[in-house]
Amino acid sequence: MAQALPWLLLWMGSGVLPAHGSQPGIRLPLRSGLGGAPLGLRLPRETDEESEEPGRRGSFVEMVDNLRGKSGQGYYVEMTLGSPPQTLNILVDTGSSNFAVGAAPHPFLHRYYQRQLSSTYRDLRKGVYVPYTQGKWEGELGTDLVSIPHGPNVTVRANIAAITESDKFFINGSNWEGILGLAYAEIARPDDSLEPFFDSLVKQTHVPNLFSLQLCGAGFPLNQSEALASVGGSMIIGGIDHSLYMGSLWYTPIRREWYYEVIIVRVEINGQDLKMDCKEYNYDKSIVDSGTTNLRLPKKVFEAAVKSIKAASSTEKFPDGFWLGEQLVCWQAGTTPWNIFPVISLYLMGEVTNQSFRITILPQQYLRPVEDVATSQDDCYKFAISQSSTGTVMGAVIMEGFYVVFDRARKRIGFAVSACHVHDEFRTAAVEGPFVTPDMEDCGYNIPQTDESTLMTIAYVMAAICALFMLPLCLMVCQWRCLRCLRHQHDDFADDISLLK
């Protein structure tokens, strides 16, 4: 998952409380989209919606509200494995490609996959090891029959990594026992020959090659007895559900089929452009990853964004640890000053040449509510934007504002305003466009690739240079050896003469 699972850092400080989890809150009727200064010329919308194939759009009642989770600990769906079926909760992760489940006792697991009890399990006699920035897991590969009770009415034979050992992978109290990697085969472990679950699903059934996610997040409940309420959402497999979003869907191309990589062309804080080379936003990639909690930004972009957010919210002072995600800030219940925090706009490459669209993110998304703090009279939050060394990661806190369509068949990702996102009476999340943005292709970061033929050429050149320098040296050594030999022979002859005397 871009690839690290979310972990909560616990710190103490003056007037600052340690972070633990989340408390939900106000959900008001959605108003019109957020206004703001357009980027360049704003063009008319060509069509309200693009035509879709039959079966791609419609109502998927059986799949609505099939996700559960806890704030900062991921969203999971119920799945069954084996014969007879064993039910497990599986984390939905668009930032990895392995379907992996706990298959041995673990202190944080209430249940696990028992391969020996399944008559349909097949052992592939192959191991797999997956390290993360923090944590790792390893296990054994096999296949078994898999279905999703609140999903399409199909059963598929899928590759399963049975996790036998792990470190800092499972989360205590998260209520999930495995991970469903929904990205492409290129990043599957141990290699890209291992077919991911969604590829198997599409190949073995008539399910269309797309899925969509509505992650609803958590605000604060009016009833404090609901403070431990789970987050929820929907994973629509094989289609798009109209009831889960408002307005139009806007699509950005999938740049490369490994992670769900996209191109960000501009970033604004409260309408003010960060004015950075757009390559910086995508260094070394930008991905959409439901398995990561935060919006993660490359170092330079993170520093510029935090500087702008600090300036916009300067009416209140916050400790440095807050901006690093290590400390919480709290206000008396119901008094959070949302208005002092700016909105963040990410402009994404559009499908039409030189056109982009923007998604606008509210502070209710990037300030993540946490639960179980020392005093229940306060609303406490963690700053959910963090620094990344592996590019931009649009994690769950971003996705919670939008209905996101992973249209694998057309190599594109769609965004629309989610019908369940948390907001206030003054501002809502927004998806707006099109905007004129030239030379967007230049914004993508190209990882330097050196093939074997290039390496061989370099090796030959280096060998030739070495030979060129070594040749005179070799000649000098040979000449020295010859002279030494002649001198040695002369000395031997002189010694013989002296003996004869």
UniProtKB/Swiss-Prot annotation:
| Superkingdom to which the source organism belongs | Eukaryota
Q: What InterPro entries does UniProt report for this protein, alphabetically? A: Aspartic_peptidase_A1, Aspartic_peptidase_AS, BACE, BACE1, Memapsin-like, PEPTIDASE_A1, Peptidase_aspartic_dom_sf
Q: Where in the cell is it found?
A: Cell membrane; Golgi apparatus, trans-Golgi network; Endoplasmic reticulum; Endosome
Modified sites of kind Phosphoserine: S498
Regions of this protein lying in the Extracellular compartment? 22-457
User: Which residue stretches are annotated as topological domain Cytoplasmic?
Assistant: 479-501
Question: What's the name of the protein?
Answer: Beta-secretase 1
